[in-house]
Amino acid sequence: MVYSTSTSGMNSSGIMFTLILTALPLIGFGQDNELESIETSVIKIYTTLAAPDYFTPWRLLTPRQSSGSGSVIQGNQILTNAHVIANASYVQAQKHNDPQRYQARVTFVSHEADLAIITVDDPSFFQDLKPLSIGLLPEPLQEVSVYGYPIGGKSLSITKGILSRVEQQVYAHAGSYLLAGQIDAAINPGNSGGPVIMNNEIVGVVMQASSGGRAENLGYFVPPSIIRHVLEDSADGANDGFPDLGFRTQALDSPAAKAAYGLKNGQNGVLVIKVFDDSPAAGKFEENDVILSIDEYEIAEDGTIKLSEDLLTDYKHAIDMHHIGEEILVHYSRAGKEGSINLKAEKARDNYSLVKGEQFDRTPQYYIYGGILFVPLNMNLIKRWGSDWARSAPVSLLKMRNEWSSPERQEVVVALQVLAGDVNLGYHDWRNWVVESVNGKQVKDFQQFANLLKQNLEDNVVFENKNGYQMVINHDKAMESESTILSQYRIPAAHSAELFSN
């Protein structure tokens, strides 16, 4: 992702958290009208970010300033990246060649697609600004131009690149797996959210860069199909997002496996390895079914579909292009017998995995009991270990990312740290400890865990992990010591505000 801060880092797939497009300063003489029209439609965005601290969830991290880019689109809207305005407490917009900054506000965010829409209420801001339209995805090897405000100067800059690849990529901002375009351009912080232009139309929104390994000068952008999906989703103001049918698959490129699951010669597809309860696929698909096609797209043995003669991508894209509530036709094979079924597209749930994805613009949950800080495990917490979190975060927590949820267990609860006091003597050095049960009752999720503590009638509360190790807290002493511990550690409340709101 690319905004003007020093918070670059790498995720486990090697994608940098800063996107950087080489800036070629624009010379302000002899520009034709079309170029000038594009220039005036590219906006610099200033933000003050105040993200919560997931190590001490009652506090905010030190506020910091950052900047990114955006472009004016229809309806007095400015299109940018979600990561440019995520956790923002204050947003401003500045026009090309105009020193004035205007207060802006966020009207819609899709963290999944790393896209956001902001606007400026001052009507004078949009005067003489021509909205840019959304174009079509360029063909491979076509040249595109990227506009934005990278660091190193205050004026608008431009870079050119060649579209080299279009395929599903992990979006670094929120970890989504969506279609993305790749261009061969070096990059600099500040271009995040800037438009990728061809034929005077937006054909992408700059979002991230590849770093590490041998790949150099590679930038990624959100393609037109994803942009249109988000804009259509924003029409009613409700963020429905992208659908998830509730099953997981693996490639089926082994001839022996194809024969074992009853595929005929020439048939291809992907093997269903997991069907989640209470999902659109529940009761309709079974493990070891083979998904042959989605709508009109036949699925190859490696899990790809053919979008055009020159474009293969993951079959998930055929699902992504639907909106919530639409019907999706799925053709499948079960033990050699073929069938078709329409599944209703439902909003992706965040609890298919035991570890929820990174969340933004939210207050973290926590509960302090007996001086022990308990929190739900999510990617926000894991990433708090720094840009090298895949190596520096506790292995016991990282392993949880590979586990599916179940009706009995939908979330992981962690005893993050012990706030030392008489009530928790013997446990002062315990930290990052996964709680499996409370007084013999399995932990389902953080809300149920908190309710077990709040409603406890036993003399002692016994926390146990999967290996049988126990942490025992006397309930009366926990209640008596609560105000003292909160005062000593300057903590405003024993739990997050919304935990018991219902």
Q: What residue ranges belong to the model's regions?
A:
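N-terminal secretory signal peptides that target proteins for export/translocation
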Residues: 1-12
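Bacterial N-terminal signal peptides
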Residues: 14-25
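A conserved glycine-rich beta-strand in the N-terminal activation segment of trypsin-fold
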Residues: 32, 52-75, 81, 100-103, ...
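Active-site region of chymotrypsin-like
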Residues: 41-47, 52-53, 59, 121-131, ...
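C-terminal recognition in membrane/secretory proteostasis and scaffolding
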Residues: 48, 59, 74, 82, ...
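Short, conserved beta-turn/loop elements at beta-strand boundaries and strand-helix junctions
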Residues: 50, 109-113, 164-172, 252-254, ...
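Short beta->alpha transition motifs characteristic of CBS
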Residues: 67, 81-86, 148, 164-165, ...
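Conserved active-site neighborhood of the chymotrypsin/trypsin-like protease fold
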Residues: 74-156, 189, 339-340
